[in-house]
Amino acid sequence: MSFTTRSTTFSTNYRSLGSVRTPSQRVRPASSAASVYAGAGGSGSRISVSRSVWGGSVGSAGLAGMGGIQTEKETMQDLNDRLASYLDKVKSLETENRRLESKIREHLEKKGPQGVRDWGHYFKIIEDLRAQIFANSVDNARIVLQIDNARLAADDFRVKYETELAMRQSVESDIHGLRKVVDDTNITRLQLETEIEALKEELLFMKKNHEEEVQGLEAQIASSGLTVEVDAPKSQDLSKIMADIRAQYEALAQKNREELDKYWSQQIEESTTVVTTKSAEIRDAETTLTELRRTLQTLEIDLDSMKNQNINLENSLGDVEARYKAQMEQLNGVLLHLESELAQTRAEGQRQAQEYEALLNIKVKLEAEIATYRRLLEDGEDFSLNDALDSSNSMQTVQKTTTRKIVDGRVVSETNDTRVLRH
């Protein structure tokens, strides 16, 4: 049996590539300020652009940045196109003015001799109008640019407004709580004032009763004709006492009011400080949240692309597996068919070999008998019957050698070698 082995060699040529320079890219914020200035006559146009640039490598989080750069470029291109159109319009108006001036001169030359009328003041008016037209064109371009800048500033202020609105709502909630405390303080103050009024009325009533009792006693003394001298201390001035009490209560109320004002002013200052601190922390947290959201969006986009790539690879793998499975089934069918044919061929070969061996034995026997008969006929009387019997009883061995060459499970060639051995 001989076997052939097929080997396939794949060679890959690598060619060195030249160094490729990749231009550096920067991510710029969407906010920018631009100004346009055009000189007289449409010449010397100058465009100045100021942007706040934040350096950053272009990576997975650079999609929003690239969109902002594209928007800026489109905006500046639009402004430049508008400015160019205005300048072209100014130039066309100047050309039209020169054409009209030439027509006026030709008309004057045809109608009458030169120098009849002085058109200098008209030329001055024309120059003034031309200057006004150019100034208006420049003003229009400047206004358009200011409108665009105002739109960008409005967007910035909108963001600031939303931030300040959140801060204002927080402060309003704090103020609402403080107003409740102030209302409670006012209620307490009203209660104290009511008590003061009640005490005043009670004091007046007691003073009136005291005066009536004094008058009654004086009348009794006068009617009895007695003179009674009482060594008593001088009566106190009730109005002065009331004034002192009122002053004390007012001083106490003023002191309480000042203490409350001071306390709530301090509380408001502390609340304002806390609100300012919390606002800064909130802004930092919002910035961090924005960056995290941008990173999350970038990662989600990468994940979606990876999922799509994985799905495509799985589909390709399924197609390849199905194709190779079909090929393997086909090859297995061919192999089974070849194995069955090989088994049939081997069985047929064995059967033919057995038949050939039987026929060969018969042939050998016949040849031996023919040789014996030939010797009997040729030798005649010299060949005895015993010799013929010995010749016929002699033992013969037939040696058969079969050589087959099989390549890839298929019989390519077959060689048979037969030898007869006598004993």
Curated annotation (Swiss-Prot):
Post-translational modification: Phosphorylation increases by IL-6. Proteolytically cleaved by caspases during epithelial cell apoptosis. Cleavage occurs at Asp-231 by either caspase-3, caspas-6 or caspase-7.
Gene3D superfamilies, A to Z: 1.20.5.170, Single helix bin, Vasodilator-stimulated phosphoprotein
Region spans: Coil 2: 242-380
Site description Cleavage, residues in chain: 231-232
Classification via Pfam families: Filament
Region (Tail) location: 381-423
Chain positions found as Omega-N-methylarginine: 46
Transcription found in the keyword field: no
Cell location: Nucleus matrix; Cytoplasm, Perinuclear region; Nucleus, Nucleolus; Cytoplasm
SMART domains attached to this UniProt entry: Filament
Region (Linker 1): 108-125
Modified residues (N6-acetyllysine): 124
Region of interest called Interaction with TRADD, as start-end residue ranges on this chain: 69-121
Induction context: By retinoic acid and IL-6.
Modified residues (N-acetylserine): 2
Tissue: Expressed in endoderm, intestinal epithelial cells and in most extraembryonic tissues.
Modified sites of kind Phosphotyrosine: 37
InterPro entries: IF_conserved, IF_rod_dom, Keratin_I
Site (Stutter): 264, 324
Stretches the record annotates as Coil 1A: 72-107
Function: When phosphorylated, plays a role in filament reorganization. Involved in the delivery of mutated CFTR to the plasma membrane. Involved in the uptake of thrombin-antithrombin complexes by hepatic cells. Together with KRT8, is involved in interleukin-6 (IL-6)-mediated barrier protection.
Family the UniProt entry places it in: Belongs to the intermediate filament family.
Protein's name according to its UniProt entry: Keratin, type I cytoskeletal 18
Organism from which the protein derives: Mus musculus
